[in-house]
């Protein structure tokens, strides 16, 4: 049974990556370019709402009826999703600028990697996001221990802490297009980038759980702001026949650092516990995250300007 659960979880993980990449690739085919940020924001708000506020209580209710019933309901939801996708009208085949012969899988991935690496804006964006995610998971790896042993949260308080990310995601999905339109893409990305080290300093020195709750809401909001702008940018400047492949390579850079960050976070606390108090050891990843996050902001922010983003859009639309 354990092996079956592991294999199933692995396959679900693969399917989720495929779904996420396909959804981002499909979006420009059903939404006008000027509405991409609004559409992406609404999609992330809906995902945060259903994943964190509707799904868990509904699952608990269904389990109360029968322990096996959630699996059948979940399976049925996929059939509903397939039917909804099939109801979308239009042609979604990639459009090639010139006729070309079909490439094999390895050559297609290589082509997507080469296109991304040659792009003066998307290449640093992918690397910057990878660094952000690595630092984020470095502090997140031991968050449960931090909440229990440093903030001394009860079970109920920890459950409330868990709602912060979803609340921020919902609000961020709604406000992100408006913030981007009013402040500009560049300053909006600076805000999201700066929130990492600022949040790490404030959380790493916090003594009250509700302070961490509020900071997590704002951090989640700015993360959605970053995603809304950068995903919409990719959708508007990557050629349609390369969008899926370039997105996949981009996500490899962005997500590949996550397990590294988790390993580093656990390692830092484990080693520091031998020389520092337990509380200091659990605070240390946040302080390190703040230091490296500040360095990342100094290096990355000059590349993330509204002019650079608009220039990339203009070149893609020539």
Q: Predicted segment positions?
A:
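C-terminal transmembrane bundle of multi-pass solute transporters/carriers
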Residues: 2, 66, 110, 117, ...
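Hydrophobic alpha-helical transmembrane segments of integral membrane proteins
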Residues: 24-25, 51-53, 255-256
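Flexible cytoplasmic inter-helical loops of multi-pass small-molecule transporters
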Residues: 86-114, 309-317
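Residues that mark transmembrane-helix kinks and helix-interface sites
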Residues: 17-25, 29-30, 56, 141, ...
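Hydrophobic alpha-helical transmembrane segments
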Residues: 2-9, 13, 38-96, 156, ...
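Juxtamembrane interface at the ends
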Residues: 84-100, 224-233, 237-238
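Extended non-transmembrane interhelical loops and adjacent amphipathic helices
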Residues: 21-36, 43, 243
């Amino acid at each position: 049974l354990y092996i079956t659960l592991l294999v199933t979880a692995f396959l679900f993980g693969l399917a989720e990556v495929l779904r996420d990449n396909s959804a981002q690739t499909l979006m420009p085919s059903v939404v006008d370019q000027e509405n991409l940020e609004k559409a992406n924001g609404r999609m992330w708000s809906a995902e945060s709402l259903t994943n964190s506020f509707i799904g868990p209580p509904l699952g608990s209710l269904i389990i109360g009826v029968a322990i096996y019933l959630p699996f059948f309901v979940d399976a049925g939801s996929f059939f509903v999703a397939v039917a909804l996708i099939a109801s979308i009208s239009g042609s979604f085949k990639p459009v090639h600028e010139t006729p070309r012969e079909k490439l094999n899988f390895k050559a297609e991935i290589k082509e997507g990697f080469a296109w991304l690496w040659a792009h003066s804006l998307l290449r640093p964006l992918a690397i910057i996001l990878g660094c952000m995610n690595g630092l984020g998971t470095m502090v997140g790896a031991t968050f449960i221990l931090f909440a229990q042993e440093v903030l001394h949260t009860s079970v109920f308080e920890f459950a409330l802490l868990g709602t912060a990310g979803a609340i921020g995601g919902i609000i961020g999905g709604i406000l992100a297009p408006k913030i981007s339109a009013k402040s500009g893409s560049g300053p909006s990305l600076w805000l999201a980038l700066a929130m990492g080290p600022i949040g790490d300093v404030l959380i790493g020195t916090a003594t009250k759980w509700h302070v961490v709750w509020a900071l997590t809401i704002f951090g989640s909001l700015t993360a959605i702001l970053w995603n809304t702008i950068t995903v919409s940018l990719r959708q508007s400047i990557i050629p349609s026949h390369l969008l899926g492949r370039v997105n996949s390579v981009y996500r490899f850079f962005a997500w590949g650092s996550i397990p590294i960050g988790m390993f580093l976070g656990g390692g830092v606390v484990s080693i520091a516990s031998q020389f520092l108090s337990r509380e200091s050891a659990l605070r240390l990843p946040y302080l390190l995250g703040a230091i490296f996050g500040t360095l990342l902001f100094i290096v990355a922010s000059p590349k993330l300007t509204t002019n650079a983003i608009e220039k990339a859009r203009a070149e893609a639309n020539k």
